[in-house]
Amino acid sequence: MADRSVRPLRHLVHAVTGGQPPSEAQVRQAAWIARCVGRGGSAPLHRDDVSALAETLQVKEFAPGAVVFHADQTADGVWIVRHGLIELAVGSRRRRAVVNILHPGDVDGDIPLLLEMPMVYTGRALTQATCLFLDRQAFERLLATHPAIARRWLSSVAQRVSTAQIRLMGMLGRPLPAQVAQLLLDEAIDARIELAQRTLAAMLGAQRPSINKILKEFERDRLITVGYAVIEITDQHGLRARAQ
């Protein structure tokens, strides 16, 4: 049942990318699944909910570099970032690729838990971090005893998966520069994109040199500035025009 539930999203990713070597496919799948993290308006829990669940939520502290959860391990609960930053990455050493950064208020682990999927990336603390953890039993009890929260949580999951699918479909048939511009706009938090070029290339099913060339063109036109594993948008209106 769980495998059938996630198959449409996997097929959609394959259709957009055309299928690539396993390592790049792994980065791509993890990156797009990481787009389904609960964030901002799509987060399933409100501030009042977290306060009401104080006795249920476990507080866990992580030093910089500490592993929060491992790729391929069975999802055993839901993580809510309280303080600090959590890096989501696949691979190791030189093959390692960062696919997302969790910020305070972000929620992860709920979709793999509901679908009985393993985690597809490793979460590691970038800074001193505090997370709230809701284990499987507590999560199931929460959904069973708080109908309003259960409805909002299911709506949140549906919204996140739908948004990810719409983004993927929106890439079809567009020139690569327009795809890159749109991806940067979608991924920006406070005008910053904290992803390596390899991850951006994998998400679009493109070669890294092609992405690098486009980013240099954008930088030359003063739309962005490019640093190590970070891109800053300096002209949002101009970049949005390139995405059309």
Swiss-Prot record:
- Key word Cytoplasm present in the record? no
Taxonomy, superkingdom: Bacteria
Q: Which residues bind a nucleoside 3',5'-cyclic phosphate?
A: 41-160
In which residue ranges does the UniProt entry place its DNA-binding region annotation? Answer: 197-216
- Biological process terms in GO annotation: regulation of DNA-templated transcription
- SMART domains linked to this entry: cNMP, HTH_CRP
Q: Which UniProt keywords apply?
A: Activator, DNA-binding, Transcription, Transcription regulation
Asked if the keyword Transmembrane helix belongs to this entry, the reply reads no
Q: What is this protein called?
A: HTH-type transcriptional regulator Cmr
Q: Which gene encodes it?
A: cmr
